[in-house]
Amino acid sequence: MPDKGFPADPRTRFRFAVALATIAGIADAIGFMQYSQLFMSFMSGNTTRMGEAASSADWVGVARFGTVIAVFCFGAFAGTLIAAWSGRWRLPALLLTQATLLLTGILIPHGPEAVPWHVYPIVLALGLQNATLQDESGRSLALTYVTGSIVRFGAGLANMLLHKPSPSFWIQGPLWAGLAGGAVIGGVLQRAFGEAAFAVPATFLLTLAVMALLLTIKHPTNDLVTSAHAPQPDARPEAKPTVSV
């Protein structure tokens, strides 16, 4: 069955994926530097910090890191539902939501250390981002963390030597480079603009949302976009859709 994930064209999907990984790196670096080494998308790091806080009976730290992890998980949950319900509009809908959440994080007042609600919209946006794109098998592409990408790239190289190459393992390298480059950009922006630097990745997301919306309107039935037969996130390509558009 032909690939119907949005964007259906692999070249378009690849460009969007690298762009989104770069944006995630920008946002994570800004948040890490701005909010006392609290990760916006690297939940492995926050999990380690939460465990360290628990070991020293720092319950404020446990609450701080634990709530951020929960919000990120909810973002992935909500993003998957939005993607499934939005049909061909999934990309503009998710990107616009992410841009709005990043700007919201700048505007709301700061919460206490144990419950930093001002970072929750930003973390939620980055959780949503992981449901934005699918690979050719209908699985969501992880765009905000790279440990899995590095593992898959290494395993892909080994499988290539074993004459069992994965068709898309090579994309993991550019995704890592995008996230790493974004982190450099985010660090520079945070030093220059502080918390207001989040407006930069929000603007990038808004620009991508407009591009995706124009593509969807201009090519509503083209494989470049998708159709009602597109698989849901994390589903096999032959899976039946639950929404008709």
Model-derived features: positions:
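Hydrophobic/small/kink-forming positions within alpha-helical transmembrane segments
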Residues: I69, C73-F77, W176-V184
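Substrate-agnostic recognition of the 12-TM MFS/MFS-like secondary transporter fold
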Residues: M40, G45, G51-E52, A57, ...
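C-terminal ends and interior cores of transmembrane alpha-helices
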Residues: A99-A114, A212-T216
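Helix-to-loop junctions at the C-terminal end of transmembrane segments
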Residues: G75-R88, Q190-R191
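Short, Lys/Arg-rich, polar N-terminal cytosolic tail immediately upstream
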Residues: M1-R13, D223-S227
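Hydrophobic core of transmembrane alpha-helices in multi-pass small-molecule transporters
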Residues: V18-D28, Q37-M40, L101, E113-T144
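Cytoplasmic-side transmembrane-helix entry/capping segments in multi-pass membrane proteins
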Residues: G87-Q98, P116-P121, L141-V146, G173
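Symmetry-related core transmembrane helices of the 12-TM Major Facilitator Superfamily/SLC fold
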Residues: L96-L101, A196-L214
